Amino acid sequence: MTSKGNAGNPPTPTPAPVKSQPLWHNLVSGGIAGVSEILVMYPLDVVKTRQQLQVGKGQSMMSSLVTMVRHDGLKMYRGIVPPILVEAPKRAIKFASNKFYEKQILSYCGNTKPTQMQAIGSGVLAGITEAFIVVPFELVKIRLQAKENAGKYTSTMDCVNKTFRAEGLSGFFKGLESTIWRHACWNGGYFGLIHTIKSALPKPTTEQGVLVNNFIAGGLAGTFGTMLNTPADVVKSRIQNQVGAGKYNWCIPSILTVAREEGFSALYKGFLPKVLRLGPGGGILLVVNEFVMKLLAGKN
C-alpha cells in the first residue's frame, strides 16, 4: 500500500505494520533460554545458596567454589533436576507473561510502546505469576544444595518424599511470600531496564551487533534486578531450608531479623556468585530468547 506523493514526486511507501508474534513463541523461546542459562551457570547458584545459609562469617566465593569442586566434583550438580524441570516452564512463563501483561497495559493506557513505569509494572506482574510456579521446585533445590543436608537426602525424589511426609503438601509452598518478593523485584528491575539500556546503546547495523546489544542490555538489567532482590532471596533460602516452624517466616520481618542480628551486609550474602550468575545469565536469557523468537518468526 502506498500514499500519494506531490506532483512529480514518486509515492511514499507506507511502512508495513509490525506483526505481533503469538504467545506460544514467547513460551518456547523463554523455555529454551532458561535451560541454556541454568546449564551454564548452575555451579554459581550452588555457591550462592550455601553462602546465604551460613549464619555469621563464612567462606568467600572463591573458597566456597574451590572447596565444592574439590570435595563434590560432579556432585556439585546435586539439586539440578528441580531447576531443570522447572526452568523451561519458569522462563517460558517469565517472558510470555511479561509480554501478556505488557499488551494488557498498553491496551489499557492507549500507547504503542511501554514507558519505563509500564515496563516495570508488567515485569512485577510477571514475577508474581512466575513465583507461584517455581516455589515447590525452589524448596527442593535449596534443601538439596544445603551443605548440612548432604547426608540427609539421597536423591531429588527422596527429598520430595521426606518433605511430604514431614510437612504435607503445604510444606512445598513454604516461602511463597518471599519468593513472590524475590521474583517481583528481579523481573521489575530486569524488564524495566532492558528497553532503556537498548535505546542508550549505539544502534546495531549487523546481526552480531544485535546479539552484542542484547547481551549487554540483558546483563546490565540482570545485575540491577539482582541488586534489588538479593535480600528477599537470602531470607527465602533460610525459610525454605527450615523443616517445620522456625526462626524465619515472612519476608520483611526476616530481613529485619537478619539485619539486626548479623548486620546489613548479611542481606547480601551470596551476592557475588549470584550476580556473576544472573548478570551474564540475564544476557544469555535475552540473547537466546530473541534469537529463538526470530527463528520462529522466520518459520511462519
Swiss-Prot record:
Annotated family: Belongs to the mitochondrial carrier (TC 2.A.29) family.
Record SUPFAM superfamilies: Mitochondrial carrier
GO MF entries: antiporter activity; dicarboxylic acid transmembrane transporter activity
Gene3D superfamilies from the UniProt entry: Mitochondrial carrier domain
GO biological process: lipid transport; mitochondrial transport
Solcar repeats: from-to residues: 21-104, 114-200, 209-295
Membrane topology: Multi-pass membrane protein
Segments crossing the lipid bilayer: 27-47, 74-93, 120-140, 171-191, 209-229, 278-298
GO cellular component annotations of the record: mitochondrial inner membrane
Substrates-to-products reaction catalysed: 2-oxoadipate(in) + 2-oxoglutarate(out) = 2-oxoadipate(out) + 2-oxoglutarate(in); hexanedioate(in) + 2-oxoglutarate(out) = hexanedioate(out) + 2-oxoglutarate(in); L-2-aminoadipate(in) + 2-oxoglutarate(out) = L-2-aminoadipate(out) + 2-oxoglutarate(in); glutarate(in) + 2-oxoglutarate(out) = glutarate(out) + 2-oxoglutarate(in)
Stretches the record annotates as Disordered: 1-20
Reported function: Transports dicarboxylates across the inner membranes of mitochondria by a counter-exchange mechanism. Can transport 2-oxoadipate (2-oxohexanedioate), 2-oxoglutarate, adipate (hexanedioate), glutarate, and to a lesser extent, pimelate (heptanedioate), 2-oxopimelate (2-oxoheptanedioate), 2-aminoadipate (2-aminohexanedioate), oxaloacetate, and citrate.
The organism's place on the tree of life at top rank: Eukaryota
UniProt keyword terms in alphabetical order: Antiport, Lipid transport, Membrane, Mitochondrion, Mitochondrion inner membrane, Repeat, Transmembrane, Transmembrane helix, Transport
Family annotation (InterPro entries): Mit_carrier (IPR002067), Mito_2-oxodicarb_carrier (IPR051752), Mitochondrial_sb/sol_carrier (IPR018108), Mt_carrier_dom_sf (IPR023395)
Species for this entry: Dictyostelium discoideum (Social amoeba)
Predominant cellular place of this UniProt entry's protein: mitochondrion
Record localization: Mitochondrion inner membrane
Official protein name in the record: Probable mitochondrial 2-oxodicarboxylate carrier
